[in-house]
């Protein structure tokens, strides 16, 4: 079975695609999402083989969302768009294919045929890593979804319950992005196995006798530094 996740902010568009896909014996629709933030979490949890992704969505577009996915778990991307002008850009973002809205059954069948051929070669395909830098981090907290600009990020921490972003004001939000994704796509530096820090917010490095250290940020919060990453942090500030 080919596991499919549909992401589109238009309910009717999701329904139309769902109807077309439900007629395929080897297709399993594992979920539907109305925005990119929901979709990022669904990709991590559901592990779809294929992502049918609308390009034009509010706040975070489909093109932007691709750059936020963990390269290790990125499915095939089939972009959905009402405008042919997005086709070239879609393939620059490592798309497997793109479909123009309204989706035609024959055109969809061609995409599914290609997917089946790829699946016969390997069970799961991971697309090339997108090197585009993230300008913000999508977060949830206090009953809302918001985009935290990189300049406002103080540090990011990983816990048993997930990854959390702390702002310059000390407020904390949950993100579906992994530490690895954030490390590779933002200016945040690794200072500990469970922490990334924004060096623009650094005020002081407090050295400890055991070879470890502690970062004092301008908002007064502290971030641990392990011996493994202390040297690279010193180099980052010219020491």
UniProtKB/Swiss-Prot annotation:
Alphabetical keyword list: DNA-binding, Phosphoprotein, Transcription, Transcription regulation, Two-component regulatory system
Residue positions where 4-aspartylphosphate is found in the record: 54
Gene3D superfamilies per UniProt: 3.40.50.2300, LytTr DNA-binding domain (2.40.50.1020)
Segments forming domain Response regulatory: 3-116
Family matches, as SMART domains: LytTR (SM00850), REC (SM00448)
Domain HTH LytTR-type: 137-239
GO function terms (MF aspect): phosphorelay response regulator activity; transcription cis-regulatory region binding
Organism domain of life: Bacteria
PTM summary: Phosphorylated by BtsS.
GO terms under biological process: regulation of DNA-templated transcription
GO cellular component, one term: cytosol
Task performed by this protein: Member of the two-component regulatory system BtsS/BtsR. BtsR regulates expression of btsT by binding to its promoter region.
Protein name in the entry: Transcriptional regulatory protein BtsR
Organism: Salmonella typhimurium (strain LT2 / SGSC1412 / ATCC 700720)
């Amino acid at each position: 079975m080919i596991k499919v996740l549909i992401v589109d902010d238009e309910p009717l568009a999701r329904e139309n695609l769902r109807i077309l896909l439900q007629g395929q014996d080897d297709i399993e629709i594992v979920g539907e999402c109305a925005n990119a933030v929901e979709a990022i979490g669904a990709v991590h949890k559901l592990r779809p083989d294929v992502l049918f992704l609308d390009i034009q969505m509010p706040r975070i577009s489909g093109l932007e969302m691709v750059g936020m996915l963990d390269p290790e778990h990125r499915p095939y991307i089939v972009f959905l768009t009402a405008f042919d002008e997005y086709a070239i850009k879609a393939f620059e973002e490592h798309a497997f294919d793109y479909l123009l809205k309204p989706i035609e059954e024959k055109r969809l069948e061609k995409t599914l045929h290609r997917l089946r051929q790829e699946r016969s070669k390997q069970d799961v395909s991971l697309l090339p890593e997108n090197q585009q830098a993230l300008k913000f981090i999508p977060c949830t907290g206090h009953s809302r979804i918001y985009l935290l600009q990189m300049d406002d990020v103080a540090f990011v921490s990983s816990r048993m319950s997930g990854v959390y972003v702390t702002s310059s004001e000390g407020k904390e939000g949950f993100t579906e992005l992994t530490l690895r994704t954030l490390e590779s796509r933002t200016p945040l530096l690794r200072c500990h196995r469970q922490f990334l820090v924004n060096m623009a917010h650094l005020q002081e490095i407090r050295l400890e006798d055991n070879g470890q250290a502690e970062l004092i940020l301008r908002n007064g919060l502290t971030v641990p530094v392990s011996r493994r990453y202390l040297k690279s942090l010193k180099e980052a500030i010219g020491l």
